[in-house]
Amino acid sequence: MGNVCFRPSRSHVSQEFSQSEFSTASPVRTSERPSDASLDAGLESSSACHRSGLRGPAKHSMLSLDEIGLVGAARWPDDAPGLNISNKSNTQENKRYCESLYQAARIAGGSIASGRVTSFDGLWRNATKWRLSRILSGDASKIDFATVRMPNTRFVTSLRRPYHSVIERVRNHSDANSEIYEGEYLGGIETKVYRQHGTISSTTIPMTIVSAVADDDDIHERLKSLPKNERRHLKDLMAASHPNMITHTDAVYLPMIKDHLESLYLQAIDPSLEQHEALELIARIHWWAASAAPDRRGSAAKAEFAARSIAFAHGIELPPFEHGAVPDIEAMLRSEEQFVEDYPNLFERPPQ
């Protein structure tokens, strides 16, 4: 096994670890609630947009200020004020983050429509630039948000809070199979496993693996069997070897996936597309980018940034995702076709 890299919690941070160590939230920059002027900033003129044939963003936002404050928020199923530590979408800090994503994606949509962003790689660079702008320069982990994952590194997300709601979903997933876990400390425990695959030019590639112990009592009994003085130490060590885990797409497949995203992008910026056709391609791009998780940090936010930017280029506004729908998690728990079918219904209301 190569190095183990833990995906971040939704406090806008992550870090690479060799053991079960997790970082705290890094500070983000503040900004004022957007005015009409700031929402229009950076948009291309209507004549520039016309040169590409794409409409570009509407002159004025079709979302309310409350909706803008939820664009890009990770709205976990248990995310409600005062409910538990997963709650972040209602904080002022998170609203500023969401407003920033909305404005930056709107500007990027104008750049797509004007012909200045001609590739998915260029759009991803825009997304990365925006994401880096939300991190203070003194944060030592900032470089991870601009670093592509390397092959032979096992990249995982532990299903601890705020990801714990995924456990029940994989247990009940219609395409999850029962397997016997082979980890170092919890080997032999029955586990439910969903294995995601993608297809590019008739080639099927393995992607995200989401797993969860079938019965919590099996974990508790195993821990109870350990000497008391070893339990806490082993609990920490088990974070990298635990059945409750998302194991992300092997980085060896990233070049192939990136080429596929370039092809999808060129299809998605065709000005002749009807709205439903554009949304289908946007959903495919969102699925591949989120499920691939190409960067060490920030891939989920960048995937949503890309989807919203392409929508803006077509004059389409995507509302916030509905409460309980965290888009990258929704992507990782679905096949491409299922995600495309469900995509319009994952928003609070229909895109317009």
Swiss-Prot record:
UniProt cross-references to NCBIfam families, sorted A to Z: XopAH
Protein name: Avirulence protein C
Keywords assigned: Virulence
Chain segments annotated as transmembrane: none
Gene3D superfamilies: 1.10.3290.20
Family of this protein: To avirulence B protein of the same strain.
Keyword Membrane: no
InterPro entries for the chain: Avirulence_B/C (IPR008798), Avirulence_B/C_sf (IPR036231), AvrB/C-like (IPR053495)
Disulfide bonds: none
Compositional bias segments (type: Polar residues): 15-29
Region (Disordered): 15-57
Highest taxon of source: Bacteria
